[in-house]
Amino acid sequence: MNAKNNDSIVISVCTGTGGVATGGYKVIDAFKEELAKINSTAKIGPRTHKVGCRGFCAKDVLVDVDINGEIETYQHVTADKAREIVASHILGKEPVKKWLVKEDYHNFHDKQQKLVLADCGKINPESIDEYLAIGGYNSLKKSLSMEPEEIIDIIKKAGLRGRGGGGFPAGIKWESCRNAKGNPKYVLCNADEGDPGAFMDRSIVEGDPHLMLEGMIIGAFAIGSPEGYVYIRAEYPLAVDRLCLALDQARERGFLGENIFGSDFSFDIKIVLGAGAFVCGESTALMTSIEDKPGEPRPKYVHTTDKGLWGKPSNLNNVETWANVPMIIEKGADWYASIGTEKSKGTKIFSLVGKINNTGLVEVPMGITLREIIYDIGGGIPRKKEFKAVQTGGPSGGCLPASFLDKPVDYETLYEAGSMMGSGGMVVLDEDSCMVDVSRYFLDFCKDEGCGQCTPCREGVAHMVRILTQITEGKGSLAHIDLLEELAQMIQDTSLCALGTSAPNPVLSTLMYFRDEYKAHVVDKKCPAGVCRNLTTFVIDEDLCTGCTLCARNCPAGAIYGEKKEVHFIEQDKCTKCRVCYDSCKFEAVKKG
């Protein structure tokens, strides 16, 4: 990169999936077109390139303009804005202040500690030269001068735990696979994150694919594997394209293939496209899918490190776990272990979504509190609504109330609270979120995504969904609550795989912390959040209504009437409980009951 040349101009445009979806490629074309005009009359050497996701996806398209090392960041850039930025900022030396990022952008990043995402948004993910320029593949070269057992000891001492689910110590898993009988051994990467609203692994592959590949190659050398697989969902076309390009570049430079770095170590990686099945995130289901069989979990009487892919010892980690490896080799186990908590080392990437002002990816040290993530980084709840809960760990995670806001985020704390770290999904819920409906939604997802092999999961989860649906429709009873708990315990105790055993978590956690909300549904026949239509009535507060007519104009059912600047009323017979009036009223005059 030429960022520090005295006559250099470098324009970096976000082209992660979020950036592309909001016009990133059009922005690049506009910059190139305008800069080409400049080059015809001035020798200033401008350069425009793609970068990966910077995390604050709500601000896309994000653009850095670097003139002689002085960087200004713009948000919500369009092709038209790009042309004005060139005219004003690059030619006129005057940044377009109205489009620069605001304080919330800096607040979003200030409390983060970016290690895995350190170079996402800085380097071109399609250029291996830019990865090499920041020290890429140096850790691999260093590893090849070490003994495999030494590398495993470093990973164990660092305390790296799997970032894809249960948090099993990576070094112990590597050691088990290396010591297992049978060859060849396989190294696998799960890039198939199936949690709704999760995009951590996708962003790493899109923004810094060589980091993950370098980690896999180091792991393969330590384990003694000649062949690896990346299992990635076909619905990630941009990530797949950049991963394929990165693999080709790595082979061309000798980082993959025969005799890597002139050593006697040979290793290559193949890509397998997943069809988007959530159950294929389970390790044995993923492996059967790679074997070109239906993605169904197998009983784990024998660990996959002993008998995994094609019956051979196999080591599976997700993208984020592999991406941590190069920095541990480079900076040492003690450095890595100094970050985080006693039992949860390093950082964790979370997909922060839901009822939150600042939506995006955040990378924070283990042990940070939920309050810091949600309020300091996430900017709190929109419209000054009250925080109700945060759902962590994906569809089979748990919902934690406000009393947990000051608890540390680590594997043990979340597990003890009835939730889990999972792959890093974090959904924020506010006062307008119905916890019964949230439970029904996530359980319904697990029902649809189950493989159908075992009766407890197949029939038990489906029956729980039916009960929750009855409760949200006003047909529930107190006996249903007891039955939900009984079914949940049975499913946890007897299901075949982790998808089944963890599926009831949203229900159990909401029953633990929001039991009164369930009782309101079955006893009072009311939904306190105003979400369940059969249990909700909307009325207009005469003292707060200004007669602005906004609710009446937006009502799709024509159920609201009243003269301008006079109190309005809702005809209950016509009201469909769609919440449009409630959400659109600027004076909070529409009340739910």
Language model segments and positions:
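Flexible inter-domain linker/hinge segments
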Residues: K98-K157, G311, N317-G332
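Ferredoxin-type iron-sulfur electron-transfer modules in oxidoreductases and energy-metabolism complexes
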Residues: M1-V10, G24-H49, D66-G92, N138-K157, ...
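C-terminal accessory/binding modules appended to enzymatic or scaffolding proteins
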Residues: S344-N358, L370, P528-T576, V580
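Conserved phosphate/anionic-ligand binding catalytic regions in large, soluble enzymes, centered on
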Residues: G18-V20, G136, I155-C177, G276-T288, ...
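Iron-sulfur cluster-binding cysteine motifs and their immediate structural context
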Residues: K59-V65, P456-A462, I540, L550-F569, ...
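Hydrophobic alpha-helical positions that pack around
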Residues: V240-M366, G378
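Gly-rich Lys/Arg/Thr-decorated short loops/hinges at beta-loop-alpha junctions or inter-strand turns
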Residues: I123-P125, Y131-N138, V187-D201, T304-L309, ...
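Short amphipathic, charge-patterned alpha-helical segments
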Residues: G215-I217, G367-P382
